[in-house]
């Protein structure tokens, strides 16, 4: 069982959100009205930091205000999901940089993605974020 990163928990708490792991089919969902992020308890078996950061991305960008747009087309849903993924990567890069002493040139996309269980289809986004980091 993996624990949630304490820096990430601080961000969740500072934003006034609750984080609840429960038995559910989807990986995670953010409910703005209740200020709660629900995550599948199956995520506790591995590092769940990416999923938490992804849901924080929806919160930060106030995607709940765009629910009609989100549900309008597959394209609009994918666009908002990608935006949440990008924010998740940026949050995790910030945490990574605060936990490990390294030079920018030492950033390794593969190690970073493996550590945080970031889906491989986001590799180009991770690499771009690393280039723009700092």
Model-assigned labels for residue ranges:
Residues 1-134:
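Active-site hotspot residues in diverse enzymes, especially metal/ion-binding acidic/histidine motifs
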